[in-house]
Structures are given as C-alpha cells and as structure tokens.
C-alpha cells in the first residue's frame, strides 16, 4: 500500500524521519563532514546568502525544467550522486534509489563502495545507470570494475578525483563504521531501537560491499575487506591515469571533485564530457570553500569548453536553481535523496525528488521565467561573499 507522504514538505522533514529510523552509525555517515565540519556546514549556509530577484505580472504557464546532461534527457538538471553505504540507509537501497530515479526521469549513479553490486542494480532496473569509479592500487580489479560497468550497459563513468586519501571523519571513527555493523554492545543496543530497519536488513542478502567481495583478490569475507579497502585507494592518481581510464572506458566520462579553475582546465583538456564542482559534501578537506562559492570561477574558466555541474550542500530546489543561475548545467544530490531513502525507501526517494522539482519550478516562476534554458544570473542579487551584482 502506497503511503501518503504529502506531509513531507521539505528535505528537512525527511531528514528527521531518517534520523529516527536509521542506526546511528549509518545516519552519522550521511549527516556529517570531516574534521570540524566547517566546510560541511558552509556548503549549505552559503546557498542562503544568495537572494533571488522577484518578477511579477509575467506569464507563468507552461513551465519546463527539462534539459540534457551529457546528452541525456532529464526532467530537471539533477542526477543522483554516487554515495557509499547506500544499502545501509535502507535494505537494497541502491536498487530502490535507482528505480525511483528511473521512474522520475533523472540519472542514478552507483558508487564503487555500494552495498548492492553493479549486477544487482542492472538486474532490477531497465534504464542505463551511471557508475562511479575509485582508482585502486589493484589496477586489475579496477579494470574489471570498468568491464563490469560496460557489461551492465552503464551509460557514463564518474571518476572521483578527490579521494586519493580518506578525510578525517571523526564520527565514522568513533562509531566504528562497518557494513554490516559489528556486534558490539553499543551497536546492539542502538539496533534494538531500530526494529523496522533490522527486519528489512534480515530480508536481504545484500549487507556488504558486493562490488568488492568476491571480485577483488583475496577478499572473500569481511575481515579481509576491511584491511583491503584501507590500503587500496591510490594516492598516486594523476591526470595520466585519467587518459588511460578514458581509453579503457570508451564512453561518456565525468570527473567529480574539481574545486579550482586550474584543475577544471586540466579536466577540460583531458577529454572528459563533464566535471563536477564538488568538495565531497565536506567529507574530505575541511576548511576549503563551499562548492557553490567555487562554482563561478570554474564556470568562468571552462564553462564554454565542458559541461560544468556541481554538488555538495544542495537541500532544496532553490539551491538547484541558484546553481543553474551561476552556470552549473547540472547538479548531483547525495544527502537529499539519502534522507528520503532512510525515511521511506523508494517512496521516500521519489518524495525527495518531487519536493526538489516543485521548489525549483515555483521559484523559477517567481523570478519571471518559464523555461530553465532561459534562466541566468540575472535572477540573483549579490551576496555577502560576492560584493558585485551577478
């Protein structure tokens, strides 16, 4: 029976439900940043410093948010970002989120560090999805990941460039983050208060990193997986690797994790089809600037050479509209869909997308536009961190 989620009117409503339903370690994994979480907070608060210009007595009928991202038609300029541990927010989480995205008309991106495997998602969806790649020291395993993504008919590869080393994530360390949770006294006590989550997890076999276990050398169980992942992220990743990965993949390539114009120029020259201005949701380098602050300089540098998107900090349709007005031709959402997933599964993801769409649509109308293609920075006023008018 379909639930009535009409009372869920904003992403914050979904966050509060997810916090109540999810085990603490997995909620904290979603809703936290690195070190002091300064960048994590700035990612959202800097959006609030941007103001719209309201226009009145204009025709608001026949509005459209439709556009294209790397040539793919999308209902709005949004793709679901790759997020690790998604299947721990809700049982079979990646499958449910992919289904919701497919039905809504936006792309879904599967993380290397997903709980459901590439094959799991492919078997349970019909639209091609995107796959996100971490570059590992085990190049044979990495090349096999690319082959598996090809075999699953993935339509784009998202290369994450900002995780050569792992950021200092204090909550994850204190919680002893693992998938599945270790049977410690603290975890067992917390899990006892999450009966719905536990029952759903008992009804699935997907409880660990299925892209890795059974595929990487000498990784057949959880004990070996822990040491393997801590050793495998490759700190030697370079632009030469990007060229090699592009050749191996042979399809659409998106580079995620760009924050500076110089790196954006290298991404454009690499032959990538799009780049994502992103600080990994504030989970890598703390005390760097917010993604929305970094966006205008990147757009100025390469906006005519490559599709520029952004993620990190998006919690509303207004945020998406502001990013578009500042030059982002697409966005990616992580926490916004994860809150919906943790709260109500597939229906929750759908509700999150409906909320974002409506907020963006109505806000665009109030700025005097009916088609997203016509929207530019003229809809914005200056901010405290940008003294000149946009």
Positions of PLM-derived features:
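Alpha/beta enzyme core
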Residues: 85, 99, 124, 140-310, ...
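Short, conserved beta-strand segments within well-ordered enzyme catalytic domains
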Residues: 51, 66-68, 77-81, 107-109, ...
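Short, basic, glycine/proline-bearing loop/turn elements
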Residues: 79-85, 128-134, 226-228
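Alpha/beta catalytic cores of nucleotide-metabolism and tRNA/nucleoside-modifying enzymes
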Residues: 1-48, 293-311, 315-390
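Short beta->alpha linker loops
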Residues: 34-35, 112-116, 137, 259, ...
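Glycine-rich active-site/cofactor-binding loop and its immediate structural neighborhood
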Residues: 74-113
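An N-cap/entry alpha-helix motif that binds or orients negatively charged groups
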Residues: 1-71, 176-237, 373-375, 381-390
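A gly/proline- and charged-residue-enriched helix-loop-helix capping module
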Residues: 103-124, 128-142
């Amino acid at each position: 029976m379909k639930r009535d989620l009409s009372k869920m009117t904003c992403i914050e409503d979904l966050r509060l439900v997810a916090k109540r339903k999810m085990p603490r370690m997995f909620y904290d994994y979603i809703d936290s940043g690195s070190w002091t979480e300064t960048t994590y907070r700035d990612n959202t608060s800097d959006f609030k410093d941007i103001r719209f210009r309201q226009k009145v007595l204009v025709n608001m009928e026949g509005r459209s948010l439709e556009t294209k991202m790397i040539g793919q038609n999308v209902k709005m300029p949004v793709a679901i970002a790759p997020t690790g541990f998604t299947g721990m927010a809700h049982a079979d989480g990646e499958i449910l989120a992919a289904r919701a995205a497919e039905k809504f008309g936006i792309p879904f991106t599967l993380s290397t560090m997903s709980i459901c495997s590439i094959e799991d998602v492919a078997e349970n969806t019909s639209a091609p999805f995107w796959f996100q790649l971490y570059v590992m020291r085990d190049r044979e395993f990495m090349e096999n990941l690319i082959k598996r993504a090809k075999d699953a008919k993935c339509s784009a590869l998202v290369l994450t460039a900002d995780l050569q080393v792992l950021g200092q994530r204090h909550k994850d360390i204190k919680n002893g983050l693992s998938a599945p949770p270790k049977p410690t006294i603290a975890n067992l006590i917390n899990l006892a208060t999450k009966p719905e989550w536990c029952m759903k997890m008992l009804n699935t076999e997907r409880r660990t990193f299925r892209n890795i276990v059974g595929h990487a050398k000498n990784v057949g169980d959880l004990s070996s997986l822990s040491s393997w992942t801590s050793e495998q992220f490759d700190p030697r990743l370079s632009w030469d690797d990007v060229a090699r990965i592009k050749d191996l993949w042979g399809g659409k390539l998106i580079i995620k994790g760009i924050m500076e114009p110089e790196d954006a120029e290298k991404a454009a020259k690499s032959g990538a089809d799009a780049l994502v201005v992103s600080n990994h949701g504030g989970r890598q380098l703390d005390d760097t600037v917010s993604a929305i602050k970094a966006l205008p300089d990147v757009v100025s540098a390469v906006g005519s050479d490559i599709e520029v998107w952004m993620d990190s900090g998006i919690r509303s349709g207004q945020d998406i509209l502001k990013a578009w007005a500042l030059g982002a031709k697409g966005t990616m959402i992580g926490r916004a869909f994860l809150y919906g997933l943790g709260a109500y599964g597939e229906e929750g993801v759908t509700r999150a997308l409906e909320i974002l769409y409506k907020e963006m649509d109505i806000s665009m109308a109030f700025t005097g536009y009916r088609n997203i293609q016509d929207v530019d920075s003229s809809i914005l006023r200056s901010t405290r961190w940008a003294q000149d008018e946009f």
